[in-house]
């Protein structure tokens, strides 16, 4: 995803996917703050801390599966749902690194700049996704940084908080 999206000219965070402990250490030293998550699966995003870099723990964890490391991007969580040619976007106010852990997260509808809305549609087309949820970080400097496009996103909570007609649009797409 990241490579294909980056080729569209969309900004992405510095990223490494690896199961080599030395690569993890070098990446951690190269960035002030690093987050990690599984390459595949729904496990939540975590901050990479000194305990994770302990040699035995790191080697044991990386024997099981590679991880995705990313430089932490300061800012606000933004999620855009793309359903065909419709794009619905909201800011997610949460104190948690991974908003899925925060039962008190507040979801507020927001307007995307036209160029970012076009990027959403281009990302969905490039990844062959008729419908998707795209996660962004909106930096304090006003830049949108792509994090991922989820091909099978949960949406009911989001729909209830925003009033966006996601279910209706999804049913319409499936009926076509």
Residue ranges of predicted features:
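Conserved N-proximal alpha/beta basic substrate-recognition cap immediately N-terminal to
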Residues: 1-12
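Short acidic-hydrophobic, aromatic-tinged amphipathic segments that line or gate anion-handling sites
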Residues: 14-19, 49
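Phosphate-binding site of ATP-dependent enzymes
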Residues: 22, 29-123
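Protein kinase-like catalytic core scaffold
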Residues: 34, 88, 132, 145-147
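PAS/PAS-like sensory domains
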Residues: 67, 129-132
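C-terminal active-site "lid" helix and adjoining low-complexity regulatory extension at the edge
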Residues: 111, 125, 129, 138-176
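Hydrophobic residue at the +6 position relative to the catalytic HRD Asp in the kinase catalytic loop
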Residues: 134-136
């Amino acid at each position: 995803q990241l490579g294909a999206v980056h080729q569209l000219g969309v900004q992405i965070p510095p990223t490494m996917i690896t199961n080599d402990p030395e690569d993890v250490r070098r990446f951690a030293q190269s960035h002030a703050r690093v987050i990690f998550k599984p390459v595949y699966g729904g496990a939540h995003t975590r901050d990479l801390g000194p305990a994770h870099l302990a040699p035995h723990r790191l080697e044991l964890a990386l024997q099981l599966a590679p991880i995705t490391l990313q430089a932490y991007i300061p800012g606000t969580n933004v999620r855009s749902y793309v359903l065909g040619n419709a794009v619905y976007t909201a800011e997610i106010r949460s104190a948690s690194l991974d908003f899925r852990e925060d039962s008190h997260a507040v979801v507020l509808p927001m307007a995307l700049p036209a160029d970012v809305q076009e990027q959403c549609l281009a990302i969905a087309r490039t990844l062959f996704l008729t419908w998707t949820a795209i996660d962004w970080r909106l930096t304090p400097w006003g830049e949108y940084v792509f994090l991922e496009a989820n091909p099978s996103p949960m949406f009911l909570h989001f729909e209830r908080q925003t009033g966006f007609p996601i279910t209706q649009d999804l049913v319409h797409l499936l009926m076509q």
